[in-house]
Amino acid sequence: MKVAKNGSPENSAGQISREELIDHLNEDLSGEYQAIISYVVYSQVLKGAEYMNIAAELEKHAGEELSHALIISKQIDYLGGQPAVQPKPVRTSEKAKEMLQFDLENEMATIQRYRERVRQCESLGEYAMAEYIREILKDEQDHLISLATALGEDVPVVKAASAHAGK
């Protein structure tokens, strides 16, 4: 049986309460704040010709993440919750490839969470909310592709989150 962040059980279909969805969305919102900060900082500190294109792309990503934060905040308010104000911790490095790798890992985790969030919204009958999250998911997948390309890697396959993963 899956267990929600607050310790109460989720049923096998992934149905959760509105309050639990608010908790999950607030965690997502904190992740969006983290992404904004990361992309703003990384876009300015990446140096050298090999990083010019990705640095410009990261600036664009920062704006998209702000848009995501606004959408998620609006959904939390719609559900009767209070949007979070704290970002998740931002990882930094002196090495450009490490910074890009941090972002790649964050995007993979974000995609996992948003896929789960779509299922949770639909299980509560919140189909419009699920559509908003699907739109965010498209951007996050594009970010993943950009980062993998900049790192010279194949785009990683994002696996479904495990039942015990802390979302």
Q: Where in the sequence are the language-model features?
A:
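Iron-associated oxidoreductase/ferritin-like identity signal
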Residues: 1-167
